[in-house]
Amino acid sequence: MNDFPWLTIIVVFPISAGSLMLFLPHRGNKVNKWYTICICILELLLTTYAFCYNFKMDDPLIQLSEDYKWINFFDFYWRMGIDGLSIGTILLTGFITTLATLAAFPVTRDSRLFHFLMLAMYSGQIGSFSSRDLLLFFIMWELELIPVYLLLSMWGGKKRLYSATKFILYTAGSSIFLLIGVLGISLYGSNEPTLNLELLANQSYPVTLEILFYIAFLIAFAVKSPIIPLHTWLPDTHGEAHYSTCMLLAGILLKMGAYGLVRINMELLPHAHSMFSPWLMVVGTIQIIYAASTSPGQRNLKKRIAYSSVSHMGFIIIGISSITDPGLNGAILQIISHGFIGAALFFLAGTSYDRIRLVYLDEMGGMAISIPKIFTMFTILSMASLALPGMSGFVAELIVFFGIITSQKYFLISKILIIFVMAIGMILTPIYLLSMSRQMFYGYKLINVKNFSFFDSGPRELFLSISILLPIIGIGIYPDFVLSLASDKVESILSNYFYG
């Protein structure tokens, strides 16, 4: 066990510091904004320092582990720890949350509560990624939902209450299945119940029971990821939420579902995952085509970007279902890659809305001349989203392709069919993304409007855009930076399978 409680401090610090903000004197919104940004930067620096000096990349076991008895009545411990699977998502959470707080500068209504909720969400997300106890994982999972619901219902578009209600119904409903899975898997088998993930990873179950556990967890994570047909909350939520909230949703919250699939479904229930993986492969392939086909029909800019997130999630599902070293590595890389790309696209969509106050693409046009910086960044990041070589998305999708090709689980004809359908999806992706850019930035619609004028990106927005773009290009050029973190853990997970 680690001598110093690094992870406890990293998890508790944001929400504790955010609580202090409620007692700060009322001296305008700027105090709250800069206080929150300072907390996020300090948290990110603390996390980076703790990981740099205490994390060994060649060790697949849990590191920085903490294990404290919490409730004596039953076997409930405050168990924290990280490995190659969680370190990338925790660093991504810190980076995106810091930039999202900077993006939230235009928010003036109830600024104190808004920034407190962002910090509370920060704690819940890091807690989920670093939990080594199933019940603690569930608590952190639920803790993170409350701030998201309030952020959706209080700040956003005209239909924000509808989208927030839809979000909470979907996620709270899926949490019932998560709780059933947690209680079932912890109470089965041994003489006394255990919630320790490390012990549960070595537990074996009757086939029928393992399938039931797998389905319960799969439903919970499929809603959050999202996986079709449980995705319908996502376009509505993204369409109405404030763009800083969208950055957190696309950049981090969706990744929690994918993380759960690997951490629990794949690691704890390998036999059931092996049985379900062909079906997940089919769903992932359909998802890529479905989202890429549906996206061009969306008038709302943020809804169109939301469907691109659904399409990218298809590659993650396929990578997880391939049960191969390249496939799983590609899925993990895609989780990190899309965290940056999704957050960046929603930020640029939000900054565009701040200027023109239009959400429908068919009402836009001709913006490129007046806002060349936003136009340039939007074009570059659209290229990143459609997996242009040299960008992180290209490497991630390419490795997933290798994962399918090298998989021993599927017949050759199945692999050819899957790759063919995925290729069609990759052809459709540039169509809806480039069409989106054309509708926004080309033509003469806004230029012909009387008194048409608005300003381009300021220093804050330019800094934010470049800050997200740099890791996208960096990972695209040198993907080993991310892959080296998880490679040993991936091998450890796949050692439970008979092929790959």
Curated annotation (Swiss-Prot):
Predominant place of localization: plastid
Catalytic activity: a plastoquinone + NADH + (n+1) H(+)(in) = a plastoquinol + NAD(+) + n H(+)(out); a plastoquinone + NADPH + (n+1) H(+)(in) = a plastoquinol + NADP(+) + n H(+)(out)
EC assignment: 7.1.1.-
A GO cellular-component term linked to this record: chloroplast thylakoid membrane
UniProt keywords, alphabetically: Chloroplast, Membrane, NAD, NADP, Plastid, Plastoquinone, Quinone, Thylakoid, Translocase, Transmembrane, Transmembrane helix
Transmembrane regions listed in the UniProt entry: 4-24, 35-55, 87-107, 113-130, 134-154, 167-187, 211-231, 242-262, 272-292, 305-325, 330-350, 386-406, 416-436, 462-482
Keyword Ribosomal protein among record annotations: no
The UniProt record lists the keyword Signal: no
Pfam families, per database record: Proton_antipo_M (PF00361)
Compartments (UniProt record): Plastid, Chloroplast thylakoid membrane
GO molecular function, one term: ubiquinone binding
Gene Ontology biological-process entries: ATP synthesis coupled electron transport; electron transport coupled proton transport
Top-level EC class as recorded in UniProt: translocase
Membrane topology: Multi-pass membrane protein
Family note: Belongs to the complex I subunit 4 family.
Family annotation (NCBIfam families): NDH_I_M
Protein name: NAD(P)H-quinone oxidoreductase chain 4, chloroplastic
Species per Swiss-Prot/TrEMBL record: Olimarabidopsis pumila (Dwarf rocket)
